[in-house]
Amino acid sequence: MKHVAGFAVIALLAATLGAEDRPVALAPVEIVAAAPAAGWVAIAPSDLMVMDLAPDAKGKPRRVVIQLLPPPFSQGWIGNVRKLAAAHWWDGLAVVRVHDNYVTQWGDPDGEDKVKAKALPEGLVTVPQNAYSAPAVGARLIRDPSRGLLYGKGLIADQDAYAITQFWRGWPLGRSADIGPAQRNWPVHCYGMVGVGRDYPPNTGSGAELYTVIGHAPRQLDRNIALVGRIIEGMEHMSSLPRGHGELGFYDLAKGDERVPIVAVRLAAEVKDLPAYEYLSTESRSFAAYADARANRRDPFYLRPAGGADICNIPVPVRRIKP
């Protein structure tokens, strides 16, 4: 019995030492922090738009920085958005809707009133419905043989409920199942994405009414409404606003709601001392490891890996570039 007990103690010590010797898996945030400088891509200032809301109740500024989508996606709407910002059209307008777990929307509170509506700048285009998607852009193959990676050729989900999904140049995309020239890509409605409000089809929206997703990703909107970008800084100013008490979360002044004024919306070229930003390249090995860690948490808090992740649960890391 003494020998049996001795063997048991030795086995226990061996198991304990083995557990201590095993490397601790990194959490996603640790993988991002350890990513080499070469793995980050600078965001062009020309792709940034800045919205300043009125200060909060304590007088603190509320700035929201939006990164606009690159070609070939949504360029008709983005062209309109650039013209609206250049004309300072949103200045003095407001956040008009905050629908819990859905969207925060801003624009002209009198936009539905033909008499009171603010005149739009000249040169805005009407964008066709087929522009909700674009010819497929593809993605470079990345594999990490040391991990059970579900990230190859940019693809993230082979069992996504809505579409094949992938990342491309820092953006989450859906992809059609077509082969060859018929294949299409489109941006998807993840948290923080910015879209174009519209009326019933065939209306596609001008870009004067914008919204951002503040809740669970409403992927049913993909290819039904245009997306023009995403919020990369200041998202807390949009998600924490009081919810509207009117229909669909619109602010109802008769019910005591107060709209949040917009002080200014500017393209980055007009904003003094705007920080520079960069994103973790979705073509990098660091992002591959990060995506795998989001899908399969192995860091000490977790008991078992989930075995997968929705594309919107793998947000692309964005940070300020240190001066």
What are these regions (language model features)?
Residues 1-4:
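Positively charged n-region of N-terminal signal peptides that target proteins for export
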Residues 6-15:
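Bacterial N-terminal signal peptides
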Residues 17-323:
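Cyclophilin-like peptidyl-prolyl cis-trans isomerases
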